[in-house]
């Protein structure tokens, strides 16, 4: 146990070193300040602007920014869906894979456009190298860049500045943040044995004399942006549990840090951009404490093991079901909480095999969406909770609510409410329909409490743009592909539109001078109140579902 806890502690310590450095760099990128990469990247960006016809880098309003996001994402989706549909006749298909069904192609396209990467297929048997490279790999960069661009536009609006230009923000997000880090990390993974080849699957002879086919492909570069962009969609069916995606402990450390580095650093970037690093560190500390607490209770459940198995063996063993021995229970726990907290969705073990405390913690992350949160958008959701907290505390003490020197009024609260309410709606409505008709809408492999968790997790993962799953669910059917596609769209674009309109509303407000009566948001007390609001509004909404799922399952096992 001690060794496992030391591994977790080392990872978190490295993360704390990364946060201020990467956060500062990203602030310079979006504030258009000079960076060390300017001599290389400025010519590249100018070339991209020239090719794309982006001659005027004019500032956009909130609605213009939202339209640009949606229009560009639609075009990307049409392009990728076309590649899937004609996969059988396109190059880079050494295994001659046919095109997937139309509903699987539609679901996969929407899933990757929305930065969710929810997979109802196994990559090595469904999509060709060309589809993985030019369709899925392309969307991994653009969807992550879209999230970062929206977050930066939102922060600019909060402090009264123009929201910026979406196409410029998207380009800079990819060229200055995603590409450099993905390139370096891809080379590191390559050095650890992750393959990068266009050769067809290899046939080998096993020690027993049988012939086995080993799937491979251009994995290393795919894996790096998969983790860095919080995409999470694996090249292989079992994702980062596969030894060709994640061979050893060092690669596991690199991939864990990759999925954590940008969302954690964005909070520091926010502090730099508003000129208040103290508030950024307070917010970071609040999220970090919740994050560590979730790791602790999940680790407790996994270390104690399954009481049914332990009673049968008359000994106490950790729960190793669904885990890779090369990682063990500790690294699987850290990964599970990190991947559901950051909305990455990649897995190095099976979440369906987690003990009830682990299932509770992962669902808790998906419900809140701010324990680091999705690429860019998770940070924006955190600020929405700050606005709600300012409004509520202002009502309680009889002060006019203000945030960053601007009044919070009815219009802002309406937008904030839409952002917070669309998430439970997108999860609970289709989840209830599925549970009412389990025989017709087949796919649930576990009866009882765990079956409830499977269904809710699938829709929560889609609504939160996470993509992981309790993979005991048989989800490659017409119902699951279409219903989760609708949830994916609702969970991605309704909040983005509301966020940008909220930012535009804040931008248009006249700044209010700070007085002795102004509620300060950079204090420990306000941060504690914010944590309470997050738990009340975010967690209690889903308490009945948690009670019917992992909590009931835990009591059944003898908590």
UniProtKB/Swiss-Prot annotation:
The alphabetical list of record keywords is: Cell inner membrane, Cell membrane, Ion transport, Membrane, Potassium, Potassium transport, Transmembrane, Transmembrane helix, Transport
What is its membrane topology? Answer: Multi-pass membrane protein
Q: List where in the cell it is found.
A: Cell inner membrane
Task: Return one GO MF term.
Answer: P-type potassium transmembrane transporter activity
- InterPro entries tied to this protein: KdpA
- Primary localization: membrane
Q: So where does this one cross the membrane?
A: 2-22, 69-89, 135-155, 177-197, 254-274, 280-300, 327-347, 354-374, 378-398, 413-433, 482-502, 531-551
Record's GO cellular component, any one?
Answer: plasma membrane
- The highest taxon in the source lineage is Bacteria
Summary of subunit composition and partner proteins? The system is composed of three essential subunits: KdpA, KdpB and KdpC.
Task: Check the record and name the HAMAP family matching this protein.
Answer: KdpA
Q: State the protein's purpose.
A: Part of the high-affinity ATP-driven potassium transport (or Kdp) system, which catalyzes the hydrolysis of ATP coupled with the electrogenic transport of potassium into the cytoplasm. This subunit binds the periplasmic potassium ions and delivers the ions to the membrane domain of KdpB through an intramembrane tunnel.
- Family from the record: Belongs to the KdpA family.
Q: State the name under which the record lists this protein.
A: Potassium-transporting ATPase potassium-binding subunit
Which gene is transcribed and translated to give this protein? kdpA
């Amino acid at each position: 146990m001690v060794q496992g806890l030391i591994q977790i502690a080392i990872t978190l310590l490295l993360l704390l070193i990364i946060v201020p450095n990467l956060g500062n760099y990203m602030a310079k990128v979006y504030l258009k300040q000079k960076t060390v990469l300017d001599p290389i990247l400025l010519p590249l960006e100018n070339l991209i602007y020239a090719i794309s016809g982006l001659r005027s880098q004019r500032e956009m309003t909130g609605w213009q920014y939202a339209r640009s996001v949606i229009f560009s994402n639609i075009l990307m989706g049409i392009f990728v869906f076309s590649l899937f549909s004609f996969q059988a006749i396109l190059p880079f298909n050494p295994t001659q894979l046919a095109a997937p069904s139309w509903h699987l192609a539609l679901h996969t396209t929407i899933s990757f456009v929305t930065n969710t990467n929810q997979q109802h297929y196994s990559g090595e048997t469904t999509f060709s190298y060309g589809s993985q490279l030019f369709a899925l790999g392309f969307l991994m960069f653009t969807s992550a860049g879209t999230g970062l661009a929206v977050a930066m536009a939102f922060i600019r609006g909060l402090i009264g500045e123009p929201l910026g230009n979406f196409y410029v923000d998207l380009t800079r997000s990819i060229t200055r943040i995603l590409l450099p880090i993905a390139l370096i990390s891809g080379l590191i993974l390559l050095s650890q044995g992750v393959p990068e080849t266009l050769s067809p699957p290899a046939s080998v002879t096993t020690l027993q004399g049988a012939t086995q086919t080993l799937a491979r492909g251009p994995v290393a570069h795919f894996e790096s942006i998969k983790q860095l962009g919080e995409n999470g969609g694996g090249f292989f069916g079992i994702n980062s549990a596969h030894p060709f995606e994640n061979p050893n402990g060092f690669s596991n450390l690199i991939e864990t840090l990759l999925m954590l580095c940008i969302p954690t650093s964005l909070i520091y970037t926010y502090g730099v951009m508003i000129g208040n690093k103290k508030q950024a560190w307070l917010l970071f500390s609040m999220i970090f404490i919740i994050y560590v607490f979730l790791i602790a209770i999940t680790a407790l459940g996994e270390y104690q093991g399954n009481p049914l198995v332990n009673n049968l063996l008359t000994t106490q063993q950790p729960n190793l079901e669904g885990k890779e021995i090369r990682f063990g229970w500790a690294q699987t726990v850290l990964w599970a909480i990190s991947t559901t907290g950051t909305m990455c969705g990649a897995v190095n073990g099976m979440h369906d095999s987690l003990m009830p405390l682990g299932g509770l913690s992962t669902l808790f992350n998906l419900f809140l969406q701010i324990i680091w949160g999705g690429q860019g958008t998770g940070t924006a959701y955190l600020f929405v909770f700050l606005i709600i907290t300012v409004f509520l505390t202002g009502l309680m003490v009889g002060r006019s609510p203000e945030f960053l020197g601007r009044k919070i009024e009815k219009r802002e609260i309406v937008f904030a409410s839409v952002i917070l309410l669309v998430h439970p709606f997108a999860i609970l409505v289709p989840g209830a329909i599925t549970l009412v008709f389990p025989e017709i809408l087949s796919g649930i492999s576990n009866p009882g409490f765990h079956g409830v968790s499977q269904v809710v997790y699938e829709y929560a993962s889609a609504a939160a743009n996470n993509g992981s799953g309790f993979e005991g669910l048989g989800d490659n059917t017409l119902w699951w592909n279409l219903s989760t596609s609708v949830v994916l769209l609702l969970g991605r674009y309704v909040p983005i539109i509301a966020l940008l309109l909220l930012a535009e509303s804040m931008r248009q407000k006249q700044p209010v001078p700070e007085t002795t009566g102004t509620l300060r948001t950079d204090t420990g007390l306000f941060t504690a109140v914010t944590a309470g609001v997050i738990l009340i509004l975010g967690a209690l909404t889903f308490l009945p579902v948690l009670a019917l799922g992992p909590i009931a399952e835990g009591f059944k096992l003898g908590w």
